């Protein structure tokens, strides 16, 4: 997914009033404020209730995998662009929760999905540094996950040094 592809998808979602946050590799890049690598997909956190509307707003994208439903949904278009939806619901207390396999639930504070970032100079909501660390630092983390966190840590150190 190129930066232009990401902006196209986000603009379509915004035109339909979809609330989202950018997660994964593009979420790291949003926090850093620049693209740091090529990306095979765009990870977005969205409400489970918005899936039908999202599919209408992104007519070129089709469901290709529901094996992790209702926690995730993978959409792809004929050009091979992929949007990986992290599907959440809101509890009465305002927490976001995601239903994972075997009945397990993961909870997120909504504030952790409201960090500010930039993609192509465009402001976006993205996963916070803390949430990115949680998503990238686990026993099944890939080499790319570890590289992404190092990029984020370098950016944070650089910002702290510039202020200090």
Task: Give residue spans per PLM region.
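Compositionally biased terminal segments of proteins
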Residues: 1-164
């Amino acid at each position: 997914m190129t930066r232009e592809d990401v902006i196209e998808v986000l603009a379509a979602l915004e035109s339909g009033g979809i609330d989202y946050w950018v997660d994964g590799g593009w979420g790291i890049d949003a926090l850093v404020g620049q693209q740091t690598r090529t990306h095979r997909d765009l990870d977005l956190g969205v409400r489970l209730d918005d899936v039908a509307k999202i599919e209408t707003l992104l007519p070129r994208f089709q469901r290709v995998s529901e094996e992790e439903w209702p926690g995730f949904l993978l959409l792809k278009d004929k050009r091979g662009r992929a949007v990986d939806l992290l599907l959440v619901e809101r509890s009465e207390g305002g927490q976001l929760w995601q239903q994972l396999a075997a009945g397990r639930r993961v909870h997120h504070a909504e504030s952790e999905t409201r960090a500010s970032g930039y993609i192509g100079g465009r402001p976006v909501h993205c996963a916070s540094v803390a949430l990115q660390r949680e998503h990238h630092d686990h026993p099944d983390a890939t080499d790319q996950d570890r590289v992404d966190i190092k990029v984020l840590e370098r950016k944070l150190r650089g910002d702290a040094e510039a202020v200090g």
